[in-house]
Amino acid sequence: NGPNGKSQSIIVGPWGDRVTN
């Protein structure tokens, strides 16, 4: 969950963060 967005879920935030469900 960082500015890199290396997860596989919904993208959140203007930085393109992805949170895992």
Swiss-Prot record:
Domain of life of the source: Eukaryota
Residues covered by region (Disordered): 1-21
Composition-biased stretches (Polar residues)? 1-10
Please name the GO terms that the record assigns under molecular function.
carbohydrate binding
Alphabetic keyword roster: Lectin
Concerning its family, UniProt says: Belongs to the jacalin lectin family.
What function is annotated for this protein? D-galactose-specific lectin, binds the T-antigen structure Gal-beta1,3-GalNAc.
Q: How does it assemble?
A: Formed of four alpha chains and four beta chains.
This protein is called Agglutinin beta-1 chain
Q: Say which species the protein is native to.
A: Maclura pomifera
